[in-house]
């Protein structure tokens, strides 16, 4: 039904809004996971390093986080990520070669989610997306919560992204209750 389809924002339309609602000079910041981390480090509460082959920083990271999330720094939507266990490789140089072949350039400490969120799907970090939009300017800008939703992985996959088979459930902005089946 065409009327029903008009109630959804397509990816193309979403990117149009994204470009219009965000300052152009911030796009590079949010397209690069490591730059985002550097800017918002106090809010992360986990370790994240830029991977550039063998380094003392990488060696120290592996001592603290032998199992970690390797990422392509400019990837999105659940692509370009993999949980790696350094102990499963014969050597650190072998791990480095593996990561370089896959263009991984960010290493991130794994997130341990709460027991309540883990009950939804224990293999993934299930997340709540709370997008906000500043809708007015001046001395008292109004910040509006824009369609919050819960992302849940499924079928043992460690990715919760809807584009990778995850389930997306809308959250009512007023009550905070889940209001769709997914």
What does each of the following model-derived ranges do?
Residues 1-25:
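ATP-binding N-terminal substructure of ATP-dependent carboxylate-amine bond-forming enzymes
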Residues 16-137:
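Active-site nucleotide/adenylate-binding loops and adjacent lid/helix of ATP-dependent enzymes
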């Amino acid at each position: 039904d065409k009327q029903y389809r008009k109630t959804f924002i397509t990816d193309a339309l979403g990117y149009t809004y994204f470009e219009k609602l965000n300052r152009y000079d911030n796009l590079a910041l949010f397209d690069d996971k490591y730059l985002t981390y550097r800017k918002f480090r106090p809010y992360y509460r986990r370790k994240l390093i830029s991977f550039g082959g063998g380094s003392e920083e990488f060696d120290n990271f592996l001592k603290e986080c032998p199992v970690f999330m390797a990422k392509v720094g400019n990837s999105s939507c659940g692509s370009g990520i993999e949980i790696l266990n350094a102990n499963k490789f014969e050597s650190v140089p072998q791990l480095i070669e593996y990561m370089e072949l896959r263009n991984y350039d960010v290493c991130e400490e794994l997130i341990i989610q709460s027991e309540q969120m883990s009950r939804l799907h224990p293999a993934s970090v299930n997340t709540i997306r709370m997008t906000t939009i500043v809708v007015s300017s001046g001395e008292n800008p109004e910040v509006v919560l824009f369609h919050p939703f819960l992302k849940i992985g499924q079928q043992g996959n460690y990715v919760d992204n809807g584009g990778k088979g995850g389930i997306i459930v809308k959250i009512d902005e007023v009550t905070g209750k889940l209001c769709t089946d997914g």
